[in-house]
Amino acid sequence: MQTPSKGKLFLVVGPSGSGKGTAIVQLKKRHPDYVFPVSCTTRAPRLGEKEGEVYSYISKEQFRAWIEEGRFLEWAEVHKDNYYGILKAPIEEALAAGKVVIREVDIQGYKKVISTLPREDVVGIFILVKDLEELKKRILKRGFIPEDEMARRMESAQKEISQMDVCNYQIESPFGHIEKVVQSIEDIIQKETA
């Protein structure tokens, strides 16, 4: 695909279990020329996670200092325990270099980003699973989740779905058809960067 003269940031949004993470993994394999910025977090690495692949692990003190310095494009404190955020500089540099930048965010993160960057630089793609029972099954396939956590995720999914129209595009994610989701994202990128 052709690189645009000025880059674009494609934010992939959707509830837990929608397939957005799996789609991004596939896009990374298929498009090594795209930029996939990592998030910073204060949580400890989980088993199998490596520094710099999905997250950069930093201390709460460092994270708070970077908030004060205005280094984050968007950030959030999750469960009053850990911070997560996306640094501005790598994204701004990639956009200035004409790169396609892809990042997964939640709906609140998307809203923060579109209030910060020029709107024409950002494209929102919402990955939708219409059936919440299907969504629940997908989440449970990953492993056991306590009932209260599942209830929280389902409530969050309903809230995100109710706000999906703030994104430029909505893609349906049928079970077992991640290739269709990836192809739809590629088609959107092609259209938006032509």
Q: Could you tell me what each predicted segment is?
A:
Residues 13-15:
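P-loop (Walker A) phosphate-binding loop of NTP-binding proteins
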Residues 21:
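Walker A/P-loop
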Residues 41-101, 107:
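ATP-dependent small-molecule kinase phosphotransfer cores
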